Amino acid sequence: MKKILLSLLAVMISFTALAQTKGDKLTITMRNGTSQVWDLTADGQTPVSKITHTADGKVGFVMTGMEDFGAFEIYDINDINNISFSIYHESEVGDVNLADPSATDKTKRLYKYLQLNYGSKTISSVIANVNWNTKEADKIFKATGKYPAMNCYDFIHIYVPKQGSNGWINYNDITPVTNWADQGGLVSLMWHFNVPKTESTVPGTDGSGVTCTPSETTFKAANVFTAGSWENKWFYQEMDKVVEVLQKLQDAGVVAVWRPFHEAAGNACLKYGESWGKSWFWWGYDGAETYKKLWQTMFNYFQTKGIHNLIWAWTTQNYNGDANTYNNDADWYPGDQYVDIIGRDLYGYNATKQAQEFKEIQARYPGKLIALAECGTDANSNTATAGIDEAWNAGAKWSFFMPWYGSNMPSNDWWKAAMSSKYVITRDQVNLNATYVEESAVNAVKNMGIGTNFGNCIDAVAMWMNMNSNSVSDFEKAWGQEPTTKPMVDFL
């Protein structure tokens, strides 16, 4: 069920609640502390069919079949503290459609959980340092008493020969990931895909000889697609290493948000300036078409290898709400059929700028979850990132947020505020079988509509305005669900 705390002081509307699923209830809580529970649906019936609010401040309940007789129970709005809806959500995953058509049910369930919370709550996350552990998460727990819900691991050092030697990571030891998952944590994975600096360079057991930076290597992304080229051999050799680990994780029941080839455009979309046209990583250096082909090649290769435990997240870049300075990077998007989540990396952004980014990205990629894939302090200017509550209330309702380590890591005070926020899900609150989350209509997401059975309720005033021109099914589609056969709510 999904709870929506609806302040009637802010909403001058009346609506009809039609039967669709069993177990839906409404609770009206009075200012004197008493409460009354009404069934909206029970065994396919609808005891309460209409709730009315009149101009003189009276709230009335109308019974099914008794509409002609008016309300059977009437309250003065001044006596009401709030009304909460407990609306049931099916927990089955048959309606989840991921980029990977063969995604496991467990993978779909993770996405369903992200989807259920989208616009209502945001998932706390952090990047691992160095990359295959929970040290940063442990620091956050020490500072706040709570673990972030999700830990992100990076395959950045998987190129090192003789993994596990000389103090390097042994990625085939998946216990740092499985232990986290066993404790209730969610998992995300990324890959700083290093390549040799030259064709003749042999990566050292000390980690030397590789880079992601295009100016430091002769590796050409466009040559990856030429069979027999050294770029082609390296690309598939390294993918096979990652596939081996992903298969072990899949066999262990671990599913993950997967974010490869991030920040591809770099400054390629900048219209002018010293860094104009420059990509930050080799995978973006040969342009958008080559980049998209890299993404699609990896996606298809993982499919052929039987990897079906991933939710694919792509990172958009370079719009920054400044169309005079930047072109957007829509040309770099691999395509809806290859992407499940859109991420954005923002450092030192205030709440207003975050909200602007969120809304622009959401408008460009409707139907996709939008996440703050990286965030934190801007180390160059020492500008802190906005607090979660501040950004949320401004309209930046990210699916999840992930601060970076080191000089980018937000302060302990920032983390304390974040982990105590009513909008933030911490590890102890994760429930992949959840069928409801609490959501305040006044503070809830303004852009995704009411969703399936009241899911992801919009701002109360916006609800009143939008429902005059949009059907429930339109909002359900926006939320990413198939429209219901009978709408839960018709606004009059």
Tell me the role of every PLM-derived stretch.
Residues 125-127, 259-262, 295-327, 368-380:
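Aromatic-lined carbohydrate-recognition surfaces of secreted/lumenal glycan-active proteins
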Residues 160-300, 304-307:
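Substrate-binding cleft of extracellular glycoside hydrolase catalytic domains
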Residues 151, 328-351, 404:
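Aromatic- and acid-rich polysaccharide-binding/catalytic face
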Residues 20-90:
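Compositionally biased alpha-helical segments
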Residues 86-170, 178, 389, 426-462:
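N-terminal module-boundary/linker segments of secreted carbohydrate-active enzymes
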Residues 1-22:
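Bacterial Sec-dependent N-terminal signal peptides
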